[in-house]
């Protein structure tokens, strides 16, 4: 008997255990269903939170983590299965309750097995749901690695194929860690380096990152480090406070920890640079450095493994490049002269391009012969040298009118590769007196834009997105012209030079223009070498670290016409000696911390342009009442807001033609909008803490930039009545505006911050030229453009938009109900943060 029991016992216990589990599942079915529903609801809420975090991260360009993607996929599967199971349980329960007692007795056996099966499934699903819950992901997305290669635009080339092939072959050799590319300015070194950069796309799997850094004659290690840091995505909020040593450590740490295979492309080195000081580890098999320079000596000092010279074009290639654009073949005599002119360009692509543009409009033999005579008059011993090239390039300058020539040389005051806003450049020219404003400022600006077109057409300026810049060789040529040919005029240009004090000047009386743009100058003390009087006309000191300007610095500058002190954040006051600047026409104090205008400002009777924008500590601008010739006044974003007293002063300035303002009082805004003259000349307005309608703002016909902070923005204009009733209907709404309406036609930049009742910005449909939009901390905004309000308008919004910033808009669900194209918006100009309901990125 015992033997039999020993055989049966394991089976008995197993069956009993199985039966207990089955009975337990039946007995616990209702309780487990309740637990399953509760756990399922918690899992769904957890999933929703994770999805919102993922969407927010992806809107900022992040990629969801693989572990998060797997978890979401598992949750979606179990979500569907659990829903089906709970539906079955609900249906069974309902069927059981509706069945008769007889039917329940007849189906007891089948019901028992069905209940047992259901109970088992519910218990199993409950276990699965619990296993997926409570993951508590610290991070759900990560920033994708930077693209291996940032492709750069490159113009059509002639004669570089052989050099490109040779350079590429050398670069691909393991033993070549560093290559130096040398050649004279304008020969095509940057173009070659650009082609090399783009060629890495073909072998992107071999490298992790290709870094392009543009150097310059005055560039320092810090600026190179900044460019590398940006490319490696390690420039956080503290980066700007780091010393060069700290930056080098960070760069080195990232490169060593990541162990990337990287290529560093340094364009336009003028002297040797310590790679160790930058933070580049000892070059190994995975590292490559390629640099360009005008000097072969730099290649030697940098210890390049191989030096590659970019030579000038052959005679045939030079003619192909020139004739490709000018087409001289049909005119035999002109063609013969053109070939001689091409020969004078020494095969230099830049010279060929500039001369080609200069001669493109010349159609007679006399004009072409005159150009050749000019080139042949230059000293032959200069041929093939940098100055010899300047002489050739100067032909284009010689064809300029006197006014245009002055405007061209002025551009050399800005840093190398600096993109100058065209409207700002024209304002400088007007301030200098290069352009006569007697027919009004708008006519003067039109003439300024015409000059820019002429300089671009002559190949002396390059154009990009309403900005212009100079090729570094053209800039060098401009500075050479000033030093060699402009009698009695001398430029001192030390931009991006790391200066901590004023440069040494042998004779201040010979200097007419000085540019110390982008340096580290903190103080301008008394200098015994200052003469009793200088002849300085232009002084650029913007973007330094100035704290004090003391002594007789201003007292000896009665000839100064343009003074730019902008973006010196630590300047809190200016000396009374500013009253000595009796010739001053343009004064830029934007971005400074001045608390009040200097007492001597009122005597500057020739001042026509005063810029006080972004002066957050300035309390009053009342002194401007004495500036009767003032044409331009800017105090957008200034603490010195418009008040009734200042409004009367502005009305009395009869010469005023351009205005940007700050307003933080409702009644002042109403009175301001009631002034047809002032409202009509306003190009920028900063509104804070106001109740305002877009219809009222729409009457500012010249508005370019608009910022509203903590404003209650409405669509109708019923709150604005009185003086301007004839110019807009107080009840105007967005549905009544047509695309032909002039409102917002010039509006290019809009900033909205902390407007808590704002739901949409449909009125931006009519800002056809909007380029930049920033919206932040407006919790009720659900969409940028309301589809219903926009119906029938027939306008595609955001066609010119280039910058989009959306922050802390928790209810924002869409940009626009319909699909919107953003033809000019680039991914790196989209900044979206904390918009959890915005599931579709603009691009």
UniProtKB/Swiss-Prot annotation:
One of its GO terms (cellular component) is cytosol. LRR repeats lie at residues 510-531, 535-556, 559-581, 583-604, 606-628. One of its GO terms (molecular function) is ATP binding. Residues 28-58 form a coiled coil. Keywords: ATP-binding, Coiled coil, Leucine-rich repeat, Nucleotide-binding, Plant defense, Repeat. It comes from the Eukaryota. Signal peptide: none annotated. One of its GO terms (biological process) is defense response. Gene3D superfamilies: Helical domain of apoptotic protease-activating factors, P-loop containing nucleotide triphosphate hydrolases, Ribonuclease Inhibitor. ATP binds at residues 183-190. Residues 141-440 form the NB-ARC domain. Pfam families: LRR_14, NB-ARC, WH_DRP. InterPro entries: Apaf_helical (IPR042197), Leu-rich_rpt (IPR001611), LRR_dom_sf (IPR032675), LRR_R13L4/SHOC2-like (IPR055414), NB-ARC (IPR002182), P-loop_NTPase (IPR027417), Plant_NBS-LRR (IPR050905). Probable disease resistance protein. PANTHER family: NB-ARC DOMAIN-CONTAINING PROTEIN (PTHR33463:SF220), NB-ARC DOMAIN-CONTAINING PROTEIN-RELATED (PTHR33463). The LRR repeats probably act as specificity determinant of pathogen recognition. Belongs to the disease resistance NB-LRR family. This is Probable disease resistance protein At5g47250. It comes from Arabidopsis thaliana (Mouse-ear cress).
